[in-house]
Amino acid sequence: MKVKKISPRGYCYGVVDAMKLANEAVANPDLPRPIHILGMIVHNRHVTQAFEDLGVKTVDGEDRMQALETIDRGTVVFTAHGISPLVRKRAIEKGLTIVDASCPDVLVTHDLIREKTAEGYDVIYIGKHGHPEPEGAIGVAPDHVHLIQYEHEIDQLPSRLFERKILVTNQTTMSQWDVSALIETIQARYPHVEVHNEICNATQVRQEAVAEQAGDCELLIVVGDPKSNNSNRLAQVSKEIAGTNAYRIGDLSELDLNWLEGVETVAVTSGASTPTPITKKVIDFLSQYDPDDLSTHDKTPFLELRSILPKVKALRK
């Protein structure tokens, strides 16, 4: 089978930095134990399991504050998705050692919200309900940040926004086409709105790569966790922009061979939080796949989870 490897794909710098910081915490004997990660360090269950295997506990809850309240001692790692000021304050009050792995691009949005709300703005924030990145952003100024994901929610915004200064910004991993459409609708309702599109560069170039490169293939496989918003958006872009059917899989074991019937050329990409070795297993399998040769249908290649984490240099005493 012909395989088209969409480029760029896979890890972004924010994910790599977050994983390195968490791995360095594990390797640092001076940090108080136990080590907890407040939510998934990045949205990939294989990465989470790799850290669990090293004795690092991933703690989750309905929100970050609820999860934090279950931690009484040790070290807490804040994930790449960013954290609200109140959660940070509470971690300090509990006497926890903090390792902050927040993505710099996310922190830029936090700074923007902090600056604009201090100047008297309300903020319309385009993001996904229930995702930790909007939770952290809203927490910067909870009385002045309004989360929307869908167009109908624009009509439900407070009436005071017609008379106030308004900023619209967004979660960094949204579909750039969805964000643009929502911004256009917001501008029609609030002509005085100030726009700051914060789709991060890594998200943008990966979406554009799919839009431009997947169109001449019969199928796109996106390798990414179901909780990874940027991975799910890549499949959406393939269907809606490139016109190519797409499926998202967490790893090779989730690939349904029925999808490959009648397909001669398949494209492969991966989300920003997907480990490269996991994507490589999918590409290698598809490259040797022959529908008429059962010996090429084995989808259970061994992968050492420890190998998906970035290496850290030994710490000197």
From Swiss-Prot:
Binding of dimethylallyl diphosphate, residues: H43, H81, H131, S228, N230, S273
Cofactor(s) the protein needs:
[4Fe-4S] cluster
Q: Where does [4Fe-4S] cluster bind?
A: C12, C103, C200
Cofactor annotation remark: Binds 1 [4Fe-4S] cluster per subunit.
Any idea which positions bind (2E)-4-hydroxy-3-methylbut-2-enyl diphosphate? H43, H81, H131, T172, S228, N230, S273
Q: List the disulfide bonds.
A: none
Under the heading PANTHER family, the entry gives: 4-HYDROXY-3-METHYLBUT-2-ENYL DIPHOSPHATE REDUCTASE
What family is it from? Answer: Belongs to the IspH family.
Q: What does this protein do?
A: Catalyzes the conversion of 1-hydroxy-2-methyl-2-(E)-butenyl 4-diphosphate (HMBPP) into a mixture of isopentenyl diphosphate (IPP) and dimethylallyl diphosphate (DMAPP). Acts in the terminal step of the DOXP/MEP pathway for isoprenoid precursor biosynthesis.
Stated name of the protein:
4-hydroxy-3-methylbut-2-enyl diphosphate reductase
